[in-house]
Amino acid sequence: MPLSYQHFRKLLLLDDEAGPLEEELPRLADEGLNRRVAEDLNLGNLNVSIPWTHKVGNFTGLYSSTVPVFNPEWQTPSFPNIHLQEDIINRCQQYVGPLTVNEKRRLKLIMPARFYPNLTKYLPLDKGIKPYYPEHAVNHYFKTRHYLHTLWKAGILYKRETTRSASFCGSPYSWEQELQHGRLVFQTSTRHGDESFCSQSSGILSRSPVGPCIRSQLKQSRLGLQPQQGSLARGKSGRSGSIWARVHSTTRRSFGVEPSGSGHIDNSASSASSCLYQSAVRKTAYSHLSTSKRQSSSGHAVELHNIPPSCARSQSEGPISSCWWLQFRNSEPCSDYCLTHIVNLLEDWGPCTEHGEHNIRIPRTPARVTGGVFLVDKNPHNTTESRLVVDFSQFSRGSTHVSWPKFAVPNLQSLTNLLSSNLSWLSLDVSAAFYHIPLHPAAMPHLLVGSSGLPRYVARLSSTSRNINYQHGTMQDLHDSCSRNLYVSLLLLYKTFGRKLHLYSHPIILGFRKIPMGVGLSPFLLAQFTSAICSVVRRAFPHCLAFSYMDDVVLGAKSVQHLESLFTSITNFLLSLGIHLNPHKTKRWGYSLNFMGYVIGSWGTLPQEHIVLKIKQCFRKLPVNRPIDWKVCQRIVGLLGFAAPFTQCGYPALMPLYACIQSKQAFTFSPTYKAFLCKQYLHLYPVARQRSGLCQVFADATPTGWGLAIGQSGMRGTFVAPLPIHTAELLAACFARSRSGAKLIGTDNSVVLSRKYTSFPWLLGCAANWILRGTSFVYVPSALNPADDPSRGRLGLYRPLLHLPFRPTTGRASLYAVSPSVPSHLPVRVHFASPLHVAWRPP
């Protein structure tokens, strides 16, 4: 007869009428019993012949993609003009006095952030905007292009002007070396960037103050150039022998963006401004050839080139426009749905390209992208606005992947110890937090996004169209892209974007000037940045508890009035550093703070309501006696694991699920196991904060016996059969807790100290978790442990009772941490063992 739920509860000692613990508990460590229960609950039967279930409620397999929905009404969010102050360290020091080594190190990391991948793969421009919504291809193209344009206008992106120069909007930083009319403007090293002087020679760089910029130019392998890149890949980048080839290649490419990807387009006609400016640029380029023979001090000729003047004059002045869009003006309409009708709606379509307020030199950047972009809903609650998704997953994949730095995340107990108090709370919303952190221009060649222009995009999507060849084609080739769909889409978009349609139909390549979200480095940098800022705030306002995780910043104070005045001063301080807050999204929580998915109050911590609801829904949909795909089990365990610390049996209760995921087998829920989990998650117990105190109860064990020292008295007992030492120590700790009721127990076993009971026999782990809930452990060396003698059967000998103080841990998120001294020789990348990584290791 299968094991009933009631019987199973009794077995786990979850009911009160169980026999004496010293007899009952060691039975749960018995392997035979564990095996029989597993068979009864159908936990060990992993090989099933019935087909697997691949969907449980909203949970599908980890890799099955949920199809995003395109919303034609999406609004592009507006971005404030975010400019983090370059002298942020000085400003903080004026405010709070000298910073600690830790704070300085963290702030230097992001001023500016640097990114050097091992290898960068370049993709053709066609892959710039992902064809995520085939039904709405044109609409998605323009909305994405508009989003990119908005980011560029907000100073978040660079626009590639030539192979070696880029333009941007907003205030420049000192490491962004400005070019003016093809000359380099050096900014003095005083990091304020107020004074600047022009270098004498015509655009020759004698020695760049920005090391990595040149370094990444000279390391050809870093750019991973492919041979088919034509003139770009000719000549090693930075050898003085190939100046002639390089001046040719750079002048030929110094206008806008040429999609040199798949050979459809002849370069000379691809950019609107090229015909007008080509001859002028040739002259200037050859005239400076004589100077560019001079060597720079590093022994490499490094040349810069003239940037074409602004393309603002109307294109109609030129002879015959090379612009795809404007060519329709001079052609006969091919049908009722010809694009000529749309192009003739306006007399002045504006410039073909726009240039930023500042031009800077950049390392050699090919006319390619390194990641695709597409739009999705901003978040599940806000479907009116869009969010740009950037796919830079190439840096996390394959043998050349970048190993991102690890960083500490406060675990649940540390978080509770820190934040569970009777303070009033509010949380600040940092708007576009990632886009606060500036990136060094040397990273630009690795983080490129863009688009190949509308004609190429449309041609790629319609399989019928022939290769477009602008220059030698007849007018008919121009009309190859005309279609009813395109015509209708463009007419609708014309209402939204007006003359911008022309600008957006041109190819463009953009590099990130601030850190993008799609790179594993970004969360690390953001965490360093906000934690350093909170650390400064805590010192500046000693009565305020400021804490952050990523872009979630919370402030706590004794009273609501105090909190409001702190809020005003701290907001002003953050604004003075250039940090943008969203005042409408400031949330006042009263005494129970919502943070990181938890509700934290003076009583302790519980999961937020929406997570509890999700768990209830999950159990409602969970099928019994049907094998469930292990990928779906991963999603279920992810949800249940988050709330596991609040249940009686904790993580150990989920061990059978972990085991099936590890062996990549389907898992079948038996009615009893499902009922057990269901009841576990129906009643959640808060995790309370640990209190400091003196330890007076000690436990110790040998494989054959256990001993306790409670105050001045001792106790001992023996096991029926010898047990593994860790199991024996865990049993001793359970006996100590149940005999004395003490919440503070001294032990010399590291596994018991860690409070992770997932590696013990399953039934014992579940029972011990419930018995030891809310217990804190203090480490006592074996030699000093008063329970050592009783455990060896010697009760008469008393060691002096230790007074071991216990201090609650706040993990690495300590508020008053003295910064550790930095070793003289740092390894290439520092790895912090994150508590999150450690806590989630399956057995």
From Swiss-Prot:
Residues 347-690 are annotated as: Polymerase/reverse transcriptase domain (RT). One of its GO terms (molecular function) is DNA-directed DNA polymerase activity. InterPro entries: DNA/RNA_pol_sf, DNApol_viral_C, DNApol_viral_N, HBV_DPOL, Rev_trsase/Diguanyl_cyclase, RT_dom, Viral_Replic_Matur_Polypro. Mg(2+) binds at residues 429, 551-552. It comes from the Viruses. Pfam families: DNA_pol_viral_C, DNA_pol_viral_N, RVT_1. Residues 178-346 are annotated as: Spacer. It catalyses: DNA(n) + a 2'-deoxyribonucleoside 5'-triphosphate = DNA(n+1) + diphosphate; Endonucleolytic cleavage to 5'-phosphomonoester. Keywords: DNA replication, DNA-binding, DNA-directed DNA polymerase, Endonuclease, Host-virus interaction, Hydrolase, Inhibition of host innate immune response by virus, Inhibition of host RLR pathway by virus, Magnesium, Metal-binding, Multifunctional enzyme, Nuclease, Nucleotidyltransferase, RNA-directed DNA polymerase, Transferase, Viral immunoevasion. Activated by host HSP70 and HSP40 in vitro to be able to bind the epsilon loop of the pgRNA. Because deletion of the RNase H region renders the protein partly chaperone-independent, the chaperones may be needed indirectly to relieve occlusion of the RNA-binding site by this domain. Inhibited by several reverse-transcriptase inhibitors: Lamivudine, Adefovir and Entecavir. Residues 1-177 are annotated as: Terminal protein domain (TP). Residues 357-600 form the Reverse transcriptase domain. Hepadnaviral virions contain probably just one P protein molecule per particle. HAMAP family: HBV_DPOL. Belongs to the hepadnaviridae P protein family. Terminal protein domain (TP) is hepadnavirus-specific. Spacer domain is highly variable and separates the TP and RT domains. Polymerase/reverse-transcriptase domain (RT) and ribonuclease H domain (RH) are similar to retrovirus reverse transcriptase/RNase H. The polymerase/reverse transcriptase (RT) and ribonuclease H (RH) domains are structured in five subdomains: finger, palm, thumb, connection and RNase H. Within the palm subdomain, the 'primer grip' region is thought to be involved in the positioning of the primer terminus for accommodating the incoming nucleotide. The RH domain stabilizes the association of RT with primer-template. This is Protein P.
